[in-house]
Curated annotation (Swiss-Prot):
Expressed in airway epithelial cells. The keyword Cytoplasm applies. Microtubule inner protein (MIP) part of the dynein-decorated doublet microtubules (DMTs) in cilia axoneme, which is required for motile cilia beating. The gene is CFAP77. The keyword DNA-binding does not apply. This is Cilia- and flagella-associated protein 77. Pfam families: CFAP77 (PF14825). It is found in: Cytoplasm, Cytoskeleton, Cilium axoneme; Cytoplasm, Cytoskeleton, Flagellum axoneme. Residues 1-27 are annotated as: Disordered. GO terms for cellular component: axonemal B tubule inner sheath; axonemal microtubule; sperm flagellum. Keywords: Cell projection, Cilium, Cytoplasm, Cytoskeleton, Flagellum. Belongs to the CFAP77 family.
Length: 320
């Protein structure tokens, strides 16, 4: 019997927990959100853009950025990450699609894990020689090959100088003088005439100079993107200051002569003839009691124009 008494309150508590949660009409069918405009964007928001900005840019789902990845059972609005508005968890996924969305024209970020410490980059070439032991144990000295004897070149400068001193002028006399006094240039003289190469510093490294290292940390941190954004903001700020500092000229007062100079006498135009059949006829049916009611209805129609646009006449919003 005591067990039957204790089971009564538990059954009542279980029935209370199983009762459905009642929701209001605004929770079940939330009103449509007003599209984003340029006036809603503040500095530091995720949807802040540089350059020429129009209201139509914030109504395009391909350009507008989402607030961020939505957690399980929670949905967020797409206005800005700094002012996230939470929606009822039971309605998650019915009003706004959460999740990251790639910006138009910008590739998705990808990353790969690097290999371990023992990994060697590049190709491994097996040496064909003895390697380090052979290099330490012996030293290959380049043996100079014997030079083959070659004919020495004539020293025409010295032969011409001697012919002039001897008083020989004609070509025949010069030819005979060269046959008798054949002066040749020795290898020692040729080596002395050549300019010796400049002395090299002892710590000089031979080979191709390596290019500067790639700034990987700046690339990974998007440093160049941040510098570009800062330059664009500084340029726009300077343009705004220049517009504010422009001198506004005073009001120009017109005189009687300037008004007479601009005055154009009106030309009376004859009205065109219209057929009686095409003359404007007043409306036969008036569904509005007064003109104020008509203007009020037209104003309401203009306000609902943004909601009735789109493919399905359900409005263009910032969320798909």
């Amino acid at each position: 019997m005591p067990e039957a008494r204790s089971s009564g309150p538990d059954l009542t508590r279980w029935r209370k927990q199983q009762q459905p949660v009642r929701r209001t009409v605004s929770q079940v069918c939330p009103p449509p959100r007003r599209p984003l405009t340029v006036a809603d964007i503040r500095s530091g928001m995720e949807n802040e853009r540089l350059g020429v900005v129009r209201d139509s840019m914030f109504q395009n789902p391909l350009i507008v950025k989402a607030a961020g990845p939505a957690s399980v059972g929670t949905s967020y609005s797409v206005y800005d990450s700094s002012a996230v508005q939470k929606v009822i968890p039971s309605l998650a996924g019915h009003h706004i699609k959460g999740g990251p969305q790639a910006e138009l024209g910008k590739p998705r970020e990808r990353s790969y894990s690097l290999p371990g410490i023992n990994f060697n980059y590049g190709l491994y070439i097996r040496g064909l020689d003895g390697g380090v032991p052979e290099a330490i144990g012996r030293w290959n000295v380049f043996k100079q090959q014997p030079t083959c004897p070659h004919e020495l070149t004539r020293n025409y400068i010295a032969m011409n100088r001697g012919a002039v001193k001897a008083g020989l002028v004609t070509a025949r006399e010069n030819l005979l003088y060269r046959q008798l006094n054949d002066i040749r240039i020795s290898d020692q003289d040729d080596r002395r005439m050549k300019k010796e190469p400049p002395p090299l510093p002892p710590n000089m490294t031979f080979g191709i100079r390596a290019r500067p290292s790639t700034p990987f940390f700046d690339l990974l941190q998007h440093r160049y993107l941040q510098l570009w954004v800062q330059e664009q903001k500084a340029t726009q700020k300077a343009i705004k200051l220049e517009k504010k500092q422009k001198v506004v000229l005073g009001k120009l007062y017109e005189t009687r002569s300037s008004q007479l100079r601009k005055y154009k006498p009106p030309v009376k135009l004859d009205t065109l003839w219209h057929m009686p059949h095409f003359q404007k006829v007043g409306r036969h049916l008036d569904t509005f009691p007064t003109e104020a009611d008509r203007q009020r209805a037209l104003k309401a129609h203009r306000e609902e124009c943004a909601v009735r646009q789109g493919t399905l006449r359900m409005g263009n919003y910032t969320h798909p």
